[in-house]
């Protein structure tokens, strides 16, 4: 334990908080261009073909981002909005593509949790 005099001279060292989405550089979202759109398989207990895209952000960093929801219209050179948020069963995927923003269309025929998938409110049936 340090003495009062040692604390006066040096002080306590602040513990730096590590960012979970460093490529965004503190921004809530970043725009980017898809360089590759492909499917990949998840870690051990799970089995699926997860849709992901390699995205070059406007700051020059290239990241792997997950495309949520059923079906998508993305291809190479699509302009997308990338937010933070990892996918637990895909190693190295620490970002999500925002559905319904820029070139990425919202999910079709979605009625619940629409705001998370960029889906407009359906017309009321009579």
Curated annotation (Swiss-Prot):
The modification 3-methylthioaspartic acid is found at residue 89. The keyword Ion transport does not apply. InterPro entries: NA-bd_OB-fold, Ribosomal_uS12, Ribosomal_uS12_bac. Keywords: Methylation, Ribonucleoprotein, Ribosomal protein, RNA-binding, rRNA-binding, tRNA-binding. The keyword Oxidoreductase does not apply. GO terms for molecular function: rRNA binding; structural constituent of ribosome; tRNA binding. GO terms for biological process: translation. One of its GO terms (cellular component) is small ribosomal subunit. It holds the Pfam family Ribosom_S12_S23. PANTHER family: 30S RIBOSOMAL PROTEIN S12 FAMILY MEMBER. Part of the 30S ribosomal subunit. Contacts proteins S8 and S17. May interact with IF1 in the 30S initiation complex. Belongs to the universal ribosomal protein uS12 family. NCBIfam families: rpsL_bact (TIGR00981). With S4 and S5 plays an important role in translational accuracy. This is Small ribosomal subunit protein uS12. The lineage of its organism: Bacteria, Bacillati, Bacillota, Clostridia, Thermoanaerobacterales. The gene is rpsL.
């Amino acid at each position: 334990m340090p003495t009062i005099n040692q604390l006066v001279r040096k002080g306590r060292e602040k513990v730096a908080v590590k960012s979970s989405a460093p490529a965004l550089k503190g921004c809530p979202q970043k725009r980017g261009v898809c360089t590759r759109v492909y499917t990949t398989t998840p870690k051990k207990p799970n089995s699926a073909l997860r849709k992901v895209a390699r995205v070059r952000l406007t700051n020059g960093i290239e990241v792997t981002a997950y495309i949520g929801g059923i079906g998508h219209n993305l291809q190479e050179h699509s302009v997308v909005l990338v937010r933070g948020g990892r996918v637990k069963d895909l190693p190295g995927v620490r970002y999500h593509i925002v559905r319904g923003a820029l070139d990425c269309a919202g999910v079709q025929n979605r009625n619940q949790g629409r705001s998370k998938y960029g889906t407009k409110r359906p017309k009321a049936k009579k």
